[in-house]
Regions:
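Active-site cores that bind ATP or allylic diphosphates and position pyrophosphate for catalysis
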Residues: 2-138
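Catalytic adenosine-cofactor/nucleotide-binding cores of aminoacyl-tRNA synthetases and other
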Residues: 92, 97, 118-187
Length: 187
């Protein structure tokens, strides 16, 4: 109930009508079911739901691997259960971090310290997207340059958006070698 009290105000009205932090796994197919919950049985720690294809009703315990959590409550639960004390997230997830932090406190836990970073952009300044294929993978970078050059790229100005594209690799590799060469003279 406490998690629902945090989640419901963040949802559109239509979504709030059917929302549950728990997604039951179908006992016959093991599929994650995105269904409305018909009833909550707190004494047994279970939810009752109806298979939309067959009309069959099931009661699923919310523990023991019988349910999956929706991602925002899941994030908070992991923080609390695993004692996570530091979490990085892209700026596009700031609101989700705040919501998950509130859920963690509701569960008598402490949310982790955080760091929000800017997103990566392609050479045209557009947000990198896996589906568009306009990005560069770590493996691709490491095919052409060292892990240290990648670290230099990642840790320079972490709160600024970075353009990540192939032509940046040689520049970062050269910059790393230059910094490494000059370090003894500056130390």
């Amino acid at each position: 109930d406490a998690v629902m009290d945090v989640m419901l105000p963040s949802l559109r009205e239509e979504r709030a009508q059917s929302y549950s932090p728990f997604l039951p796994l179908h006992p016959k197919t093991n599929r994650v079911m995105q269904v409305s919950i018909d009833e909550v049985n707190r004494s047994r720690g279970s939810i009752i739901w109806t298979d939309p294809e067959t009309g069959e009703r099931f009661e699923s315990p919310v523990t023991g691997g019988h349910c999956k959590l929706q991602w925002k409550p899941d994030w908070a639960m992991r923080w609390v259960a695993l004692g996570v004390d530091y979490e990085m997230a892209g700026k596009d997830l700031i609101d989700s971090v705040k919501l998950s932090s509130e859920i963690a406190r509701t569960l008598s836990g402490e949310p982790p310290e955080g760091f929000n970073y800017e997103l990566f952009l392609d050479e045209k300044g557009q947000k990198i997207s896996k589906s568009k294929g306009n990005g560069l993978t770590i493996d691709e970078w490491l095919t052409y340059a060292t892990p240290e050059s990648l670290s230099l790229f990642m840790y320079q100005k972490p709160r600024e958006a970075k353009r990540l594209y192939f032509d940046i690799i040689p520049r970062m590799a050269d910059d790393y070698l230059t910094f490494r060469e000059k370090y003894p003279q500056q130390a």
